[in-house]
Amino acid sequence: SLEEQLFYRYFRPAKEKEDGEWLSPAEILEDIKKNSAIPLSNKRVSVFGRVLRKHEIPSKRVHRGTVYHVVRVL
């Protein structure tokens, strides 16, 4: 999917002991929107969250929802 391609263009899953960032799907999507010329609506956030879960990106629940452990590629 477009979301999967964009995620792997700008991010990758963090390895177990690696420093990375814990970001929500909305934060990841916002970062991708800033860096790509492809318009993405905020309605895609829930779709994007499902994509991250499907790819088993490391995650944890926090007070603001689920965040994912990622590393920026670019």
Residue ranges of each PLM-predicted region?
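DNA transaction DNA-binding modules
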Residues: 1-74
